[in-house]
């Protein structure tokens, strides 16, 4: 996707440019006519020197048309510049594709280390302020409910201490002894009744067949 750009209508073809002008120089020159998206200078494959021809991609076609009317047949650094709307050769999508240069140790323009193309000494119009990097918006992730997982820790000991066996046996013996003492002090179910039990009226069934019951003293 081109993001709404129309290269066939918003790209200016400029020729007869001074060979010494760099990408950053052209960017500064043509930015007065509108938002410049990309500058491409045609260079020799072997020498990497400028051929004096460049393509200036603007954000909209109105800026491109204003540019051609303003600079066509005008002098720039002692040379008469030719400018027109570029003819689409079918490679528009490739032209507007952003290129990433991962080697930041060398200048794109001169190939020297220690600076980038924005501050290259070969820029005739001086240094250009690098564009601000777009901040990536972080998508808010909906936290998922965490499942509680019960972890069982494995013992690192291969065998148990023999002292633990004797200790557990002693505890079990002591517990059994306490339970035995408690049983001795508990009244048996067939033992003599207390005074409270004697005072309670006993229910005595009638000798004849009936659902009624008699209370005995």
Swiss-Prot record:
Keyword Transmembrane helix found: no
Keywords: Metal-binding, mRNA processing, mRNA splicing, Nucleus, Phosphoprotein, RNA-binding, Spliceosome, Zinc, Zinc-finger
One cellular component (GO) term of this entry: nucleoplasm
Iron as UniProt keyword: no
Zinc finger annotations (CCHC-type) as residue ranges: 105-122
Gene3D superfamilies according to UniProt: 3.30.70.330, Zinc finger, CCHC-type
Molecular function (Gene Ontology), one example: zinc ion binding
Pfam families found in the cross-reference section: RRM_1 (PF00076), zf-CCHC (PF00098)
Segments forming domain RRM: 10-88
BP GO annotations: mRNA splicing, via spliceosome
Major localisation: nucleus
Region (Disordered): 120-217
Sequence positions bearing Phosphoserine: 155, 210, 216
InterPro entries: Nucleotide-bd_a/b_plait_sf (IPR012677), RBD_domain_sf (IPR035979), RRM_dom (IPR000504), RRM_dom_euk (IPR003954), ZCRB1 (IPR044598), ZCRB1_RRM (IPR034219), Znf_CCHC (IPR001878), Znf_CCHC_sf (IPR036875)
Subcellular location: Nucleus, Nucleoplasm
Extent of Acidic residues compositional bias: 145-163
PANTHER family listed in its UniProt record: ZINC FINGER CCHC-TYPE AND RNA-BINDING MOTIF-CONTAINING PROTEIN 1 (PTHR46259:SF1)
Subunit structure: Component of the U11/U12 snRNPs that are part of the U12-type spliceosome. Interacts with ZRSR1.
Protein name: Zinc finger CCHC-type and RNA-binding motif-containing protein 1
Organism: Bos taurus
